[in-house]
A protein has these predicted regions:
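Conserved phosphate- and dinucleotide-binding cores of soluble alpha/beta proteins
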Residues: 1-175
Length: 175
């Protein structure tokens, strides 16, 4: 196991690393000053760029957010990664609305899946949604996600951030 290997060779690594308490390593000023590129994983991301890092179906805790909040808010570049699908390809990890929000569109610079990279900087919500669908969603779910977005745009009175909550909540059931 790699952990055992690390500790067996600790002297080899001793002069190459510095261990600090979380109050220092996760301090916003330290993160900003170093120009950190933060890469965090998510359970799901929505088409607008909000991410869920901690809850399955919005209610079952998978893991905590840890230091991801500190890093994504203060990093020079904040990247989130996920697979495009779960449950052997039957469930999209790119959804109309995440079931729980850990990180918002205001903190995320890029989203990456095995399908591609969506650089979200400077884009409005509809531009972000189209880019995430086209670059990050699995091809088998892209049509349904575009249909959701088109319907939300045509029915939502707030065109700058079109959301159809009922359709978003039913998205997984429809798959």
């Amino acid at each position: 196991d790699k952990r055992d290997e690390f500790f067996e060779n600790f002297e080899k690594y001793r002069d190459k690393m510095i261990l600090r308490p979380q109050e220092i390593s996760n301090h916003p000023e330290v993160i900003r000053r170093l120009g950190v590129i933060a890469i965090n994983t998510v359970i799901e991301a929505d088409i607008y760029g909000n991410t869920n890092s901690s809850y399955i179906d919005g209610c079952r805790l998978m893991n905590g957010v840890g230091g991801s909040g500190d890093y994504c808010e203060n990093a020079g570049l904040s990247i989130f990664i996920t697979k495009s699908t779960a449950k052997d390809g039957t469930l999209s990890c790119i959804v109309p609305q995440v079931s729980h929000v850990d990180h918002t569109i205001h903190e995320i610079h890029a989203l990456i899946t095995e399908q591609g990279v969506a650089d979200l900087r400077g884009l409005d919500p509809v531009e972000r949604a189209n880019l995430i669908i086209d670059k990050c969603a699995h091809p088998k779910f892209r049509k349904a996600l575009h249909e959701y977005l088109d319907n939300a745009e045509s029915t939502c009175k707030y065109k700058e951030n079109p959301v159809d909550m009922q359709a978003a909540l039913n998205f997984e059931k429809a798959m």
